[in-house]
Curated annotation (Swiss-Prot):
GO terms for cellular component: cytoplasm; nucleoid. The gene is mraZ. This is Transcriptional regulator MraZ. GO terms for biological process: negative regulation of DNA-templated transcription initiation. Forms oligomers. PANTHER family: TRANSCRIPTIONAL REGULATOR MRAZ (PTHR34701:SF1). Residues 5-47, 76-119 form the SpoVT-AbrB domain. Keywords: Cytoplasm, DNA-binding, Repeat, Transcription, Transcription regulation. SUPFAM superfamilies: AbrB/MazE/MraZ-like. It holds the Pfam family MraZ. It comes from Enterococcus faecalis (strain ATCC 700802 / V583).
Amino acid sequence: MLMGEYQHNIDAKGRLIVPSKFREELGEKFVVTRGMDGCLFGYPLNEWSQLEAKLQEMPLAKKDARTFVRFFYSAATECEIDKQGRINIPANLRTHASLEKGCVVIGVSNRIEIWSDERWHAFSDEAEENFDELAETMIDFGF
């Protein structure tokens, strides 16, 4: 299971250190794509395969489904962890997530998320302010 929050920097070449606690579960290669809320999602290959199977079941006749699948897949890239524990994040994904220097890498169960410092702290601050109300809504999901 992927969990935790780690601060790292992205270098001028777009390389980011993958937290050592995540490397074994992610494997030598994993898929990074656009995420929601202005971050990037990173999936181990086995999780990506399961997600692909679900996406292939989306109804092609529905415009929203086509749009989502196109947008999600078009940015997906397989990243390989180098000997220094880094991945190279393509420019289009760095732009999507506003990654410039400081980054936060978090584990979210079966995936990682890569955030710019600024976006993560804004998101985190808002979530913390509303945590009690948010927790209350989890009842609707059977939590």
